[in-house]
């Protein structure tokens, strides 16, 4: 009985330590936005960019955006160029996914509550 109670307490502590997730449907974010509009809205809502590793930004869209000060970009696919950007607000994470190959043309494709691999 005591062992079971300790296991439950440990589970509660571990669950409490996990980051919470962002709202899956924030009213201030939509798929019609450009990346610049979405980024502005995300920052106004109190989210902070999660800075990615500078060593991973030596090519294409990722490099161009990183050099323009968009430090939260983590990767872009080749071809249609889906890009990932990560933000944090307290213990919540927000992953913004865009589509496009150049900054003015980047559009919001989707978003999730995923945290980057750390």
Language-model features: where?
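Amphipathic alpha-helical segments
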Residues: 34-51
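Short N-terminal segments immediately surrounding and downstream of signal-peptide cleavage
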Residues: 23-39
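A short, surface-exposed interaction/processing loop segment used at functional sites
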Residues: 99-118
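Low-complexity, intrinsically disordered Gly/Pro/Thr-rich segments
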Residues: 90-100
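A cross-family detector of function-defining hotspots
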Residues: 46-91
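Bacterial N-terminal signal peptides that target proteins for export
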Residues: 1-8
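Sec/Tat signal peptide C-region and signal peptidase I cleavage site
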Residues: 18-22
